[in-house]
Amino acid sequence: MRNIKAAVEVNTVIIAETIAQVRAQVKEWKEQGLTVGLVPTMGYLHEGHASLVDKAVSMCDRVVASDFVNPTQFGPNEDLESYPRDFDRDCALLEEHGCSMVFHPSVEEMYAPDAATFVEILSDMPKQLCGKTRPIHFRGVCTVVSKLFNIVTPDKAFFGQKDAQQLAIIRRMVRDMSYGIEIVGCPIVREADGLAKSSRNTYLSEEERKAALVLSKAVFLGEKLVREGETDADKLVSAMKACIEAEKLAKIDYVSAVDAVTMESVHRIDRPVLVAMAVYIGKTRLIDNFLTEDCAK
């Protein structure tokens, strides 16, 4: 840890690279009676991540952000090696938004060479939506988030609604494992033209960037139909698919309506429903979603 005492005194973000350093600092904070918030990230931060930090700062005395590209949530032929990274830029953003500490471990720090323990939800929740084409993804997510919970021992943890399935799965894991942690979901942050903020947006060419607007266009269409009284989830999904299919650079992975808590498929909108999608724009896989209960707000 670099200049931890001075960093705390001048309100500069602390950089921790080991589990021991994080635990020592959090112990000091908790001995002072301070509350701790956690914002897990894979780095290459944008305004969506900044909004999570802002929310955490507003609710907690100290905020820890993790900056770790977690290899266990990437499958074969996914973008682990090419995933964008810019740690110095991340630190500047975190400091600007009042983050207290960034945890930036190596893979070796987080996973022993012979690590053989994973955290996995055995219901159908991780098998729906993104899990259909990314079968090991949520096992990796649950494992790394569980490890971060054990390392940081936060009072609250903050996750974005853009990864809605992940948020639901983390809530279930916290319930099932009796973690004494409040999970706070935060709204999707969008570009001025509607595209959901994502680190993977940097993969898009200029033409693909324009084509990617079809995701938010489909979301806004779905929200409009719900506000107008549509309760047939199948009709809603069909209309959104037709919207996306009109874009020649778009290839649908899925568009689905599911129970917002269990992730089970639904045919009628008679409860809180998550309408989610994953769409390839060229070679880049993007996600977006909305909650039907938010449409009346």
Report each predicted region and the residues it spans.
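Phosphate/ribose-recognition catalytic cores of enzymes acting on nucleotide-derived substrates
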Residues: 239-297
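Nucleotidyltransferase catalytic core that binds NTPs
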Residues: 2-249, 258-262, 290
